[in-house]
Regions:
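Catalytic core of nucleotide-sugar-dependent glycosyltransferases
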Residues: 208, 216-240
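Short, flexible, basic/aromatic active-site loop/helix in glycosyltransferases
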Residues: 123-124, 138-156
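Glycine-rich, basic loop-to-helix element that forms the pyrophosphate-binding segment
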Residues: 68-86, 107
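Acidic donor-binding loop at a coil-to-helix junction in glycosyltransferase catalytic cores
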Residues: 180-189
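Catalytic beta-strand/loop signature of glycosyltransferases that borders the donor
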Residues: 124, 198-205
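Conserved donor NDP-sugar-binding/catalytic core segment of glycosyltransferases
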Residues: 103-135
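Short aromatic/hydrophobic "clamp" motif used to bind/position activated sugar donors
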Residues: 91
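Short, well-formed alpha-helical segments that are part of the catalytic scaffolds
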Residues: 11-26
Length: 272
C-alpha cells in the first residue's frame, strides 16, 4: 500500500539521518517499501548509515531501494527520480532529518481506507531544534480541499514532510519539478487546478527539525527572486490572478529583506 520516498545529500547530518530511518522502523505498522535517493555523492558516514539500514529493513521484510544520482540535482528532481521506483499505490514523503511518530503509517493507512477519493493528504507538524517538543511550536494547516485551495493563495497549505499521495495522481500532473524551495508548493497548485482532492489530518504525525540555518535560507534578494518565479508559474496555471500575486508578494518583499533576528521573530509569530 505505502512506499516511503526520501532524499539524502552530502550535507545531511548522519545522526539525524539515522534518527529519521529509525523512526520508520519503529512504526506500529511498517511501510511496504522505502525508496532512498542519494542526491549526489555522499560521505562515508552517510553511506555507513545506509548500509546499516539496508540490513535492518531487510530483516523486517521491508524492501529498501537505494538510488544514487551522480551529481546533486536538488530536491524536486531527486524526488521525481525516486518516485519511479516506488511500487506501491501511495507514496509517503519523509525528510532525512525529521522523525515520524510511531503511528504515522498506521494512521495513514486508516485514512486511506476511509477516504479513497483523496489524492493527497498531509498532517500537522511539530517543530524542534534539539529534541522533539523543545520548542512547543506547531504548524497546522486547513483540513478540507476548499480550505487548502483558499489558504494556498497566501501560504503553503500542506506540510510537505507529512504528505502521503497517490502515485497515479502525482504522475498525472507531471510529477515534481525543479522549482527551488517551492517544489512541493508548486505540486499542490498543479493538483488543485486540475481538480484533484487534497486534505489534511488535524493531528501532528511528524516532528520536524528546524536547524541548519532554516531562517537564513529564507531571506535575501536571491530567495525573493525565487518567490517571483513561483508566482509567475502560478499565474501561468491560472491559480493566481493579478491581485492574488500582489497580495502574496507584498509581505514577502518586506520579510525576505529583514535581518535574521527580526525574521526569526516573524517566523515564530506565524507559527503561533
Amino acid at each position: 500500500m505505502i512506499s516511503v520516498l526520501m532524499s539524502v545529500y552530502v550535507k545531511d547530518h548522519p545522526g539525524h539521518f539515522q534518527e529519521a530511518l529509525s523512526s520508520l522502523l519503529s512504526q506500529t505498522e511498517l511501510p511496504n517499501q522505502v525508496v532512498l535517493v542519494c542526491d549526489g555523492v555522499l560521505n562515508d558516514e552517510l553511506d555507513n548509515v545506509i548500509e546499516e539500514y539496508l540490513y535492518k529493513f531487510s530483516s523486517h521484510h521491508v524492501e529498501f531501494i537505494v538510488e544514487r544520482l551522480k551529481i546533486n540535482q536538488g530536491l524536486g528532481l531527486a524526488l521525481k527520480h525516486g518516485s519511479h521506483f516506488c511500487n506501491q499505490e501511495y507514496i509517503l514523503r519523509m525528510d532525512s532529518d525529521d522523525i515520524s511518530r510511531r503511528d504515522r503509517v498506521e494512521v495513514s493507512k486508516r485514512f486511506i481506507n476511509d477516504n479513497p477519493d483523496i489524492d493527497v493528504f498531509g498532517t500537522g507538524i511539530e517543530e524542534f531544534e534539539y529534541h522533539p517538543g523543545d520548542l512547543n511550536r506547531y504548524r497546522m494547516v486547513p483540513k478540507t480541499n476548499a480550505g487548502i485551495y483558499s489558504y494556498g493563495k497566501k501560504r503553503n497549505p500542506m506540510n510537505h514532510v507529512s504528505v502521503c499521495m497517490k502515485k497515479a495522481s502525482l504522475f498525472s500532473v507531471g510529477n515534481y519539478e525543479s522549482v527551488i524551495y517551492h517544489e512541493d508548493y508548486y505540486l499542490w497548485v498543479k493538483l488543485l487546478v486540475n481538480n484533484f482532492k487534497l486534505a489534511n489530518i488535524n493531528e501532528c504525525l511528524v516532528d520536524v527539525r528546524v536547524g541548519n540555518d532554516l531562517i537564513g535560507r529564507r531571506k535575501g534578494l536571491a530567495y525573493l527572486k525565487l518567490e517571483f518565479e513561483f508566482v509567475n508559474r502560478c499565474r501561468d496555471l491560472g491559480y493566481f490572478n493579478v491581485l492574488d500575486a500582489i497580495y502574496y508578494l507584498i509581505p514577502r518583499v518586506f520579510i525576505r529583506l529583514l535581518p535574521d533576528t527580526l525574521l526569526n521573530s516573524v517566523y515564530k509569530k506565524l507559527r503561533d
